[in-house]
């Protein structure tokens, strides 16, 4: 007899109902719970899967390069990045009638194509690619790399090549290699590419495989490096009149600290970027030699942690016990990694638009909007995952004995204070912000907009002024020509930075007013409420006053029956489930704010945001409704245009989103009865009754229905907004 899915759990494989399939999918990646799993095998499986993950990423990027080289217009775009629309790939669709074929034959193509809004053209252009041949070479290189990583993943699953558990637990060696090897060395390699290939290309000199060993990236060669005369590499930078991609106005510097932006491309100076990566490389390569391995020199992380113990004893045992706890818990490690990655992804979103690194990308408004929204959404999900795995750590891996009176134990002991403070902050922010919005909404509706309560964000304006914004008249730090901060920075990044921040042409520290003040506090409400739910879920995961033995029930459980009233909805998984709704709510407000404010800046119509963003109807009417009109007209009685694909996606996103509620607002018994009626009808219908099934159909469990509902809600939510965002921006700016 063939073994049934799932092979990793004999219990589930023998389940006679459709529960087998659902629970099989739900626990497929929960390796710890699989039959016969040992700790060593667990680490080996996860390690091997990393190679597969990298192979998929390289294959994906290889596909991007290949399709742009084959079907795109990279060479034409490179000649005129500001006016040619970049093509992602061709569309072959047998459903297209003549109207659709005409509508999607765009961007200078001779047949239907998709326009690229990912920014890859700008990236490849900035790093020195100019021809389709360059793209094909990159594609083939990544394809080979992908195959190598797949082989490495397979190899590390073979008995002879499986690392031992002690190898995985050797934290110091891993840190050294990851810091120096992965971060440090790769940053150094990237600096090398920028200096040897990208910067010469930006100055009109092509460097390829044929001449890169004979072309000096700097006229002085390596002499200044070996003589310690490093400042030579910063002398003679590109001038303000430099035409990117040509020798006109170009300098010879390779490592600079000019500050501000290249006047023509409105992107960071390539020589500044190279300098930044070199600095990162040096720091991380040094950091990768800090930790003690079998040579007996350097820091021991365990000793460092155990030394973190305030002498007066006011904070208990400090960090004692953390080394073993962290080193023995994959969930703890994953939670910290996800928290860090979530923060850095959100920072990427903020910096991509305020300090664009790629040439001419600042003028491709749809791409800027897409990249901001994309990174902010991803950051949202990753941060939620950090708390989910933090909660799983506390349930499965936390040992109260090993952590007696240390920082972890003390956080758990005063969790009530933490949770109640978060609750108070959320209530305060929610009632005050909503109160202001509703008040303003009412007085505007009654025709007396002058009665609005409008609060200037003076503290935020002060922070902007400290960074050099002169608009507000605060005489502080960089906004004061005579301050110590200004004097200290004058020789390096200052004049250029001040020009950029005050020019009105960049997205650096946009002017802010009462509308920004209100939406900032709405976002703060969303962030604090999401955090409250996630923190409470994790801190109560092991037990609460209501259910002291909660940890024995695992990460997700529906209820402990009617005998213990009120134990439904209190598992750590339920907290994660609820938090994702709040997180989506918050990222919605963040992206609405960013998009509307920037739309008005790009259109030269900032007054619209300033006047309409202070009351609710302004957001609904002047942002959502007004900007959806072009999108909704993608199809109309007169035919179709190139927004129709987004129009369709907008409708489809709403459908998926609404379907989510069918799973979220439902009760098991109803579905069970319905299923049994359908089965009855099926068995009595000719033809239909020829097909039978081995699994007895049963309704989804409470937790399953929630995860299916949440998945539909989430996917529908961001498909709807993605279509709105891209169509409303592209409809205005192409």
From Swiss-Prot:
Residues bound to chlorophyll a B1 = 654
Q: Which reaction does it catalyse?
A: reduced [plastocyanin] + hnu + oxidized [2Fe-2S]-[ferredoxin] = oxidized [plastocyanin] + reduced [2Fe-2S]-[ferredoxin]
Name the major location: membrane
Family matches, as Gene3D superfamilies? Photosystem I PsaA/PsaB
Q: Where does chlorophyll a B3 bind?
A: 662, 670
Q: Which residues bind phylloquinone?
A: 671
Q: Where are the transmembrane segments?
A: 46-69, 135-158, 175-199, 273-291, 330-353, 369-395, 417-439, 517-535, 575-596, 643-665, 707-727
Q: How is the cofactor bound?
A: PSI electron transfer chain: 5 chlorophyll a, 1 chlorophyll a', 2 phylloquinones and 3 4Fe-4S clusters. PSI core antenna: 90 chlorophyll a, 22 carotenoids, 3 phospholipids and 1 galactolipid. P700 is a chlorophyll a/chlorophyll a' dimer, A0 is one or more chlorophyll a, A1 is one or both phylloquinones and FX is a shared 4Fe-4S iron-sulfur center.
Residues that bind [4Fe-4S] cluster: 559, 568
Q: Which UniProt keywords apply?
A: 4Fe-4S, Chlorophyll, Chromophore, Electron transport, Iron, Iron-sulfur, Magnesium, Membrane, Metal-binding, Oxidoreductase, Photosynthesis, Photosystem I, Thylakoid, Transmembrane, Transmembrane helix, Transport
Identify a single GO molecular function assigned to this protein: chlorophyll binding
The membrane topology of this protein is: Multi-pass membrane protein
* Entry keyword annotation includes Membrane: yes
| Localization (cell) | Cellular thylakoid membrane
Q: What class of enzyme is it?
A: oxidoreductase
Q: Which GO annotations describe the biological process of this protein?
A: photosynthesis
Keyword match Transmembrane helix:
yes
- Which PROSITE patterns has this protein been placed in? PHOTOSYSTEM_I_PSAAB (PS00419)
Q: Which GO terms describe its cellular component?
A: photosystem I; plasma membrane-derived thylakoid membrane
Q: Which domain of life is it from?
A: Bacteria
Any idea of its EC number? 1.97.1.12
Family as reported in the entry's similarity comment: Belongs to the PsaA/PsaB family.
Query: Which purpose does this protein serve, as stated in its record?
Result: PsaA and PsaB bind P700, the primary electron donor of photosystem I (PSI), as well as the electron acceptors A0, A1 and FX. PSI is a plastocyanin/cytochrome c6-ferredoxin oxidoreductase, converting photonic excitation into a charge separation, which transfers an electron from the donor P700 chlorophyll pair to the spectroscopically characterized acceptors A0, A1, FX, FA and FB in turn. Oxidized P700 is reduced on the lumenal side of the thylakoid membrane by plastocyanin or cytochrome c6.
**Oligomer status and interactors:** The PsaA/B heterodimer binds the P700 chlorophyll special pair and subsequent electron acceptors. PSI consists of a core antenna complex that captures photons, and an electron transfer chain that converts photonic excitation into a charge separation. The cyanobacterial PSI reaction center is composed of one copy each of PsaA,B,C,D,E,F,I,J,K,L,M and X, and forms trimeric complexes.
Q: Which PANTHER family match?
A: OUTER MEMBRANE PROTEIN, OMPA-RELATED, PHOTOSYSTEM I P700 CHLOROPHYLL A APOPROTEIN A1-RELATED
In its UniProt entry, what is this protein called? Photosystem I P700 chlorophyll a apoprotein A2
Q: What is the lineage of its organism?
A: Bacteria, Bacillati, Cyanobacteriota, Cyanophyceae, Synechococcales
Gene symbol here is psaB
